[in-house]
Amino acid sequence: MDNVLQVDSDLFPNISTNTSEPNQFVQPAWQIVLWAAAYTVIVVTSVVGNVVVMWIILAHKRMRTVTNYFLVNLAFAEASMAAFNTVVNFTYAVHNEWYYGLFYCKFHNFFPIAAVFASIYSMTAVAFDRYMAIIHPLQPRLSATATKVVICVIWVLALLLAFPQGYYSTTETMPNRVVCMIEWPEHPNKIYEKVYHICVTVLIYFLPLLVIGYAYTVVGITLWASEIPGDSSDRYHEQVSAKRKVVKMMIVVVCTFAICWLPFHIFFLLPYINPDLYLEKFIQQVYLAIMWLAMSSTMYNPIIYCCLNDRFRLGFKHAFRCCPFISAGDYEGLEMKSTRYLQTQGSVYKVSRLETTVSTVVGAHEEELEDGPKTTPSSLDLTSNGSSRSDSKTMTESFSFYSNMLS
């Protein structure tokens, strides 16, 4: 790989370097200042925003639900990558010289793969949870313990996938500078790095996005393409509306990730088509822009949560209540308002000519109602023809942010 790609690449520095060449990528000071400001925005926004997301969930007992644990894992992975890799990657890309030693060279090439893997498979787990909750509501849901086990498995697989790149990373002293690079085992066709590169790209991008796309397509057809019965209860309308809002929010999260990382993956597939492209002097600016877009994916989720979810918005307002231009809202009063199902009941609705079943099953110790006004009906008419009914007992308990989120 040529100079700029060898030193710049976080995830796939997989092309050999001509180490005899001097550093040809030198930028004027004003460009460095602009890029530094742009990358600083990512670090500050991502770290602060994702830490607040973790606080909103973990500091409020009823936010500690199955799906929200995956959101905590997602926030942790993104905040960690922003904190540990963004600044280092920027300085390396700008100066084309490695200042941080062998250990951090290995970590710098190792951790981003693990973090991206953990991020995208946390989103996949959320998509699977939404799929099961809406398409197969009568099936058993993950317990809190099982959810933590799944998160641990995600990280174990992430670390295993990233291990080869960290293991083969090394520093090399050139005539005027030190570079961080990956020395793959010798092979005439560089088969090891090519296979690894393709496997990583498939596993951390195309495969999970394919699974997520299928899950949300089926969920979307169920929630939007089906006709809501005209005589169904207000509670049913509220639940369907709430589920739609949640799915919309998660689709925005996934699409944002896909858009941010697509140019990055395309960029590192180009050496197999036109290796000489990386010898162009303008390629450093292209790389800085592409890397900024990829790294910026770590800062958007807190903004999306705040914009599209009332409870997260309230949590952010409370977290930043000391700011003079932010109204904290009725945080204390809102904590006293929540409606939760205490009995596990199946609410089955026959929807549209396809007889699509949309069931709502709420665990006695787990999920809570999502959006909409909180009511306490003693009996609900559950089908379009009124032939099936189920009594649901409810009671008012203290507020949970999650009552607006992902039941």
UniProtKB/Swiss-Prot annotation:
Residues 365-394 are annotated as: Disordered. The keyword Cell membrane applies. The chain crosses the membrane at residues 32-54, 65-86, 107-128, 149-169, 195-219, 249-270, 284-308. Keywords: Cell membrane, Disulfide bond, G-protein coupled receptor, Glycoprotein, Lipoprotein, Membrane, Palmitate, Receptor, Transducer, Transmembrane, Transmembrane helix. It is found in: Cell membrane. Its main location: membrane. Residues 55-64, 129-148, 220-248, 309-407 are cytoplasmic. Residues 1-31, 87-106, 170-194, 271-283 are extracellular. A lipid is attached at C322 (S-palmitoyl cysteine). GO terms for biological process: positive regulation of cytosolic calcium ion concentration; positive regulation of flagellated sperm motility; regulation of uterine smooth muscle contraction; response to pain. Glycans are attached at N14, N18. The keyword Glycoprotein applies. Belongs to the G-protein coupled receptor 1 family. This is a receptor for the tachykinin neuropeptide substance P. It is probably associated with G proteins that activate a phosphatidylinositol-calcium second messenger system. This is Substance-P receptor. It comes from Canis lupus familiaris (Dog). The lineage of its organism: Eukaryota, Metazoa, Chordata, Craniata, Vertebrata. The gene is TACR1.
